[in-house]
Amino acid sequence: KTPGQGMEFYSLREYLPGDAFRSINWKAFAKTGELMVNEKTRDAVTDVFIFLDTRDVSRIGTVLKNPLEMGTVAAASVSNYFIRRRDSVALVTYGDKMNFLPAETGDKQNYKILSQLAAVEAKGSMPLQAVTNAMSPRMSRGSPVFIISSLEGDGTTLPAIRNLAGKGHSVVVLSPSSIDLERLVSRIPRMSYEVLKLERQNRLTAISGYGAKVIDWMPDVELSQALLQVRSV
């Protein structure tokens, strides 16, 4: 068990600025003369699902900076974070086919996830909705979902995310900007670039309209900075 915002009593600790007034243990204060607060156990997340896009379009960019490489690093970081919180994590990769690693906890699961990520290749064009439809029966209602994808060349993204949100899932979309990654290797006329950026922004805005938290991940932004926006999960 770990401390957090749950219901079950975990331990007493010293009062810190910002602690809720109602969490003060007045009996402990009467005995010790020191302000102490009740710390509760964190309610465990049932499962965390990470969907990583490994389609052919994920190769856009340089050898080291492309949606697949950026996405693989992000998936490893997110899974490690939740496994260290003692949550269970599932990994789904989709490109030419879907690969599913069922949710588990612990270091062994972390190793399995890293092994699967090390083997990914950019190929295929499997749509996201086909993947989420196949996975839906295996996902408990309300499970947090991370979708790591450039979102390019897939018209099913919007309905897939709408369906996930409709089933109570907290959805985070971490999207490497393939338009900006492409600029690293080829010259895009300014007008064309601006049109493509506007189309992408409209797509991201539409996704956020379904309640998803959307991160437009630029090539020059470190993963840690991008993930600052999802700490509330």
Show the residue positions of the predicted features:
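A conditional alpha-helix N-cap/helix-loop micro-motif detector
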Residues: 5, 71, 124-128, 154, ...
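Von Willebrand factor type A / integrin I
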Residues: 133-145, 151-233
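Short, electropositive alpha-helical surface patch
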Residues: 101-115, 228-233
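An amphipathic, basic-hydrophobic helix/alpha-beta surface used to engage anionic
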Residues: 1-104, 144-148, 155, 160-163
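Von Willebrand factor
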Residues: 108-143
